[in-house]
């Protein structure tokens, strides 16, 4: 699933090409693409015609097109959602779920989703955020992110540190890949109890998370397959710089110890046994 760096890479590409343009035509090709929109496909497309895109914004893994009249076209990419820019005359991709044309011509916007876990909906804007995601916490790159408040709520969770990082109501945009990478940089085991994390350790963890996000953004995100691409259809290449994720059996880039892969919440965690030893009181 795309995490913050991938969604932010897409957001930047969309903003460059779409801000200020007016939607002249919209079409939905698969009902699951708008299953979260209670009015259905006809209402969804009808309410978009004539709307101008004023901004393309993001919170965590969600992105939205802020439209005039305090309305947002809200998107979640799920496992395989893609926004692609293309000329109207170019061939349609295999898993095209929706398309949007503009009154000023090409390029048009296409929503492609192989697994159909992603989706689009319309939502009212409240304080510049779609009402339906107002419960999602700011992410670490958001100017509204408060480190002291995060630490206070973090230690109250009484869970393992990685579980807390994946809680989108506590901090948004963090998924399995970047949680593992940040924990490696901060030298923390994923089962370290949040109650044991001091303010100083929390600052170290957040600094590690910021650093890995910024490095991933410079690389255009992480692509393990063709399911994540930017708006031009290009893959990111941060996978070449990953320290632990997907590197089981390979040497730690810091100490040389073999990276291990362990089951975690129906997925996997990757860590260095030497740099990230099991804590005295692990919270699995």
Swiss-Prot record:
Q: What is its EC number?
A: 3.2.2.23, 4.2.99.18
Give the source's domain of life in one word. Answer: Bacteria
Q: Does the keyword GTP-binding apply?
A: no
Query: What residues form the catalytic site here?
Result: 2-3, 61, 267
Q: Which InterPro entries match?
A: DNA_glyclase/AP_lyase_DNA-bd, Formamido-pyr_DNA_Glyclase, FPG_cat, MutM-like_N-ter, Ribosomal_uS13-like_H2TH, Znf_DNA_glyclase/AP_lyase, Znf_FPG/IleRS
A single GO molecular-function term is: damaged DNA binding
**Residues holding DNA:** 95, 115, 157
Tell me the Gene Ontology biological-process terms attached to this UniProt entry: base-excision repair
What the entry lists under Gene3D superfamilies is as follows: 1.10.8.50, MutM-like, N-terminal (3.20.190.10)
Name its co-factor(s). Answer: Zn(2+)
**Entry keyword DNA damage:** yes
| The record's free-text note on cofactor binding | Binds 1 zinc ion per subunit.
> Which keywords annotate this record?
DNA damage, DNA repair, DNA-binding, Glycosidase, Hydrolase, Lyase, Metal-binding, Multifunctional enzyme, Zinc, Zinc-finger
Q: Which PROSITE patterns match?
A: FPG_CAT (PS51068), ZF_FPG_2 (PS51066)
Reactions that this protein is recorded to catalyse: Hydrolysis of DNA containing ring-opened 7-methylguanine residues, releasing 2,6-diamino-4-hydroxy-5-(N-methyl)formamidopyrimidine; 2'-deoxyribonucleotide-(2'-deoxyribose 5'-phosphate)-2'-deoxyribonucleotide-DNA = a 3'-end 2'-deoxyribonucleotide-(2,3-dehydro-2,3-deoxyribose 5'-phosphate)-DNA + a 5'-end 5'-phospho-2'-deoxyribonucleoside-DNA + H(+)
CDD domains assigned: EcFpg-like_N (cd08966)
Q: Which Pfam families match?
A: Fapy_DNA_glyco, H2TH, zf-FPG_IleRS
Zinc fingers classed as FPG-type: ranges: 243-277
Q: Which residues form the signal peptide?
A: none
Q: Which family does it belong to?
A: Belongs to the FPG family.
| Subunit structure and binding partners | Monomer.
Role: Involved in base excision repair of DNA damaged by oxidation or by mutagenic agents. Acts as a DNA glycosylase that recognizes and removes damaged bases. Has a preference for oxidized purines, such as 7,8-dihydro-8-oxoguanine (8-oxoG). Has AP (apurinic/apyrimidinic) lyase activity and introduces nicks in the DNA strand. Cleaves the DNA backbone by beta-delta elimination to generate a single-strand break at the site of the removed base with both 3'- and 5'-phosphates.
- Supply the name of the protein: Formamidopyrimidine-DNA glycosylase
Source organism per entry reads Acidothermus cellulolyticus (strain ATCC 43068 / DSM 8971 / 11B)
Q: Which gene encodes it?
A: mutM
């Amino acid at each position: 699933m795309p995490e913050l760096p991938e969604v932010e890479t897409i957001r930047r590409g969309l903003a460059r090409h779409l801000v200020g343009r007016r939607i002249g035509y919209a079409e939905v090709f698969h009902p699951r693409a708008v299953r979260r929109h209670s009015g259905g496909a006809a209402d969804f497309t009808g309410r978009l015609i004539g709307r101008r895109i004023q901004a393309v914004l993001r919170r965590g893994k969600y992105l939205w097109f802020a439209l005039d009249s305090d309305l947002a076209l809200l998107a979640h990419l799920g496992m395989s959602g893609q926004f692609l820019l293309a000329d109207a005359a170019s061939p349609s991709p295999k898993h095209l779920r929706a398309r949007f044309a503009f009154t000023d011509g090409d390029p048009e916007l296409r929503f492609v989703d192989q697994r159909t876990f992603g989706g689009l909906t319309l939502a009212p804007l409240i304080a510049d955020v779609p009402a339906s995601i107002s419960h999602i916490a700011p992410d670490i790159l958001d100017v509204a992110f408060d480190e002291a408040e995060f630490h206070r709520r973090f230690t109250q969770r009484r869970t393992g540190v990685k579980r807390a990082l994946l809680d989108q109501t506590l901090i948004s945009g963090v998924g399995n890949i970047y949680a593992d990478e940040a924990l490696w940089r901060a030298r923390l085991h994923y089962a370290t109890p949040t109650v044991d994390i001091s303010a100083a350790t929390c600052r170290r963890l957040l600094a590690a998370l910021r650093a890995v996000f910024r490095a991933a953004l410079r690389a255009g995100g992480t692509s393990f397959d063709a399911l994540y691409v930017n708006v031009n259809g290009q893959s990111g290449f941060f996978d070449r710089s990953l320290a632990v994720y997907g590197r089981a059996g390979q040497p730690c880039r810091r100490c040389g110890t073999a990276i291990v892969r362990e089951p975690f919440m129906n997925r996997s965690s990757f860590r260095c046994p030497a740099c990230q030893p099991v804590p005295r009181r692990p919270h699995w």
